[in-house]
């Protein structure tokens, strides 16, 4: 039940937003078209006692109060016309925002690069230490192998066998 109420709320909100957006564009279109048509112009015109026709100024003020005429004329301070000299007071922030963003990113990348370099050097050191430990262990093992091989060679040699046999004869 809660899901359906939530869904209904979103649908109503979406319809409301579309209605507001479409109503805003329709009011601009209606005000533009009413100035061109003769039937609506008659209702906006007032005749004076002398018979001259005076048009109402509410039509022009309504079209100028909407944001569309300012954007079309280019007199807004947020729009940059591409000229070298900038006399707009509010456009300084437009130039500051793109230049500050890459600086922050570069610092973050430098930190990441430094961290990666540190990690790589630490990994190299650890690998070298592991290799050194392996070398030490292997050298110890090699010494033991050599010693055991030497002992085995002595046992296998004829001199050693003769000595052993003589000693065993003497003992009895």
From Swiss-Prot:
Signal peptide: 1-22
Expressing tissues: Low expression in first to third instar larvae salivary glands.
Superkingdom of origin organism: Eukaryota
Keywords: Repeat, Signal
Positions annotated as Sequence repeat: 27-32, 33-38, 39-44
Acidic residues: bias regions: 25-45, 78-95
Record region (3 X 6 AA tandem repeats of S-S-A-D-S-D): 27-44
Biased composition (Basic residues): 104-172
Amino acid composition bias (Low complexity), ranges on this chain: 55-77
Region annotation Disordered: where it falls in the sequence: 25-172
Record flagged with keyword Repeat: yes
Iron among keywords: no
This protein's name: Pre-intermoult gene 1 protein
Organism the protein comes from: Drosophila melanogaster (Fruit fly)
Lineage, opening ranks: Eukaryota, Metazoa, Ecdysozoa, Arthropoda, Hexapoda
Annotated gene: Pig1
């Amino acid at each position: 039940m809660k899901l359906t109420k939530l869904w209904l709320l979103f649908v109503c909100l979406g319809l409301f937003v579309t209605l507001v957006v479409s109503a805003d564009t329709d009011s601009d279109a209606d005000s533009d078209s009413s100035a061109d048509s003769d039937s609506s112009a008659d209702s906006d015109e007032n005749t004076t006692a002398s018979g001259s026709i005076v048009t109402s100024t509410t039509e022009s003020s309504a079209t100028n109060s909407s944001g569309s005429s300012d954007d079309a004329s280019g007199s807004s301070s947020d729009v940059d016309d591409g000229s070298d000299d900038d006399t707009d007071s509010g456009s300084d922030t437009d130039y500051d925002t793109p230049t500050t963003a890459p600086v922050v990113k570069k610092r973050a990348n430098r930190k990441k690069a430094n961290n990666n370099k540190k990690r790589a050097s630490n990994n190299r050191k650890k690998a070298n230490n592991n290799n050194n430990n392996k070398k030490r262990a292997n050298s110890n093992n090699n010494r033991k192998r050599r010693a055991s091989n030497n002992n085995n060679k002595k046992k296998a040699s004829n001199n050693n066998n003769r000595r052993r046999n003589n000693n065993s004869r003497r003992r009895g």
